C-alpha cells in the first residue's frame, strides 16, 4: 500500500484543532485524516512549557503507531512549546505547526490596533515575542490573553449569552473604531467567530488555519506523498477524554 494513502495526523489540546481539520478536508479532499484531541488535559494554555511539551509528545507517539505520513500541530500553545523539538525528533515526516496570523492582519493596512486573542502561554512564549517584533514597527499590536475561553468552547458553549458576556468583558477596554483587526491565536477561537463579529461588527477577524493547510499541502508535495486519488478521504476522530459528548461535539464542530 502506498504511503500516499496513509493518514495525516492532526493534534490539539482539545476540539480547537477541528477548525484546522475542517480547512484541511476542504483543501485536501482525497487525504485520510486522524484527529486527536487531548481534552482530558485541556487547556494547555495555562500549563508550563515542559508540561505542554510532554503532553504533545505523548499524543504524537500514539499517532505514529497509526502510521501517519505527516503531522499537523493544530494548537498554537503546543506549537510554541514543542514544534522545534518535534521536528528534531521526527525528521522522517513533515511536521507543520500553527502561529497567529499576524502577517495577513498587518497587510490589511487598516488604521488602529491589531488585537491578538490567544492563551496566556502562547502570548508569553519567545516564539510569539519574535513574531511580534517582526511586525510591530508596521502596526500597533495588542496582546489579549483569554483564559477561560478554551474551557467554554470545550463545554460546547460557542454561542449565546454566556459567550457574549465573556467576549464583551474582554473587549470593554477597546473602541471598535480603533481596532484594525482581530487575530485568533488559538485554534479553538474560530468557533466563536460569529459571536466576536456580532460585537465587533465590521472589524476583520483572521485565523491561521488557511495558511497552515497551504503549508501542509506544500510539504506533502515536496515529500511526494500528496494523495491525488479520486476517492474522498476518511476522517477518524479520537479524544483522550473517553466521553461520547466530546466526540459528538467534535463531529458537530466539523459540521461536514
UniProtKB/Swiss-Prot annotation:
Pfam families in UniProt: Asp_Glu_race
Top-rank lineage group of the source organism: Bacteria
GO BP field: cell wall organization; peptidoglycan biosynthetic process; regulation of cell shape
EC numbers: 5.1.1.3
Keyword presence, Flavoprotein: no
Catalytic activity: L-glutamate = D-glutamate
Keyword Cell wall biogenesis/degradation: yes
Family, as annotated: Belongs to the aspartate/glutamate racemases family.
Function summary: Provides the (R)-glutamate required for cell wall biosynthesis.
Listed name of the protein: Glutamate racemase
Species name: Clostridium acetobutylicum (strain ATCC 824 / DSM 792 / JCM 1419 / IAM 19013 / LMG 5710 / NBRC 13948 / NRRL B-527 / VKM B-1787 / 2291 / W)
Species lineage: Bacteria, Bacillati, Bacillota, Clostridia, Eubacteriales
Gene designation: murI
Amino acid at each position: 500500500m502506498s504511503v500516499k494513502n496513509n493518514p495525516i495526523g492532526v493534534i490539539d489540546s482539545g476540539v480547537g484543532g477541528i477548525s484546522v481539520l475542517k480547512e484541511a478536508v476542504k483543501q485536501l479532499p482525497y487525504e485520510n485524516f486522524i484527529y486527536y484531541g487531548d481534552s482530558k488535559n485541556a487547556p494547555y494554555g495555562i500549563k508550563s512549557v515542559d508540561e505542554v511539551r510532554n503532553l504533545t509528545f505523548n499524543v504524537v507517539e500514539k499517532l505514529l503507531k497509526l502510521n501517519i505520513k505527516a503531522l499537523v500541530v493544530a494548537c498554537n500553545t503546543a506549537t510554541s512549546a514543542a514544534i522545534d523539538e518535534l521536528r528534531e525528533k521526527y525528521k522522517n515526516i513533515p511536521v507543520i505547526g500553527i502561529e497567529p496570523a499576524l502577517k495577513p492582519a498587518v497587510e490589511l493596512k487598516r488604521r488602529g490596533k491589531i488585537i491578538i486573542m490567544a492563551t496566556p502561554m502562547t502570548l508569553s512564549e519567545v516564539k510569539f515575542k519574535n513574531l511580534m517584533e517582526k511586525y510591530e514597527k508596521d502596526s500597533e499590536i495588542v496582546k489579549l490573553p483569554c483564559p477561560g475561553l478554551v474551557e467554554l468552547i470545550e463545554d460546547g458553549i460557542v454561542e449565546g449569552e454566556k459567550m457574549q458576556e465573556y467576549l464583551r468583558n474582554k473587549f470593554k477596554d477597546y473602541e471598535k473604531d480603533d481596532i484594525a483587526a482581530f487575530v485568533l491565536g488559538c485554534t479553538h477561537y474560530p468557533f466563536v467567530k460569529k459571536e466576536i463579529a456580532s460585537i465587533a461588527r465590521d472589524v476583520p477577524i483572521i485565523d491561521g488555519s488557511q495558511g497552515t493547510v497551504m503549508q501542509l499541502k506544500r510539504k506533502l508535495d515536496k515529500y511526494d506523498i500528496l494523495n491525488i486519488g479520486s476517492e474522498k478521504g476518511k476522517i477518524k476522530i479520537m479524544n483522550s477524554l473517553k466521553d461520547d459528548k466530546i466526540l459528538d461535539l467534535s463531529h458537530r464542530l466539523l459540521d461536514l
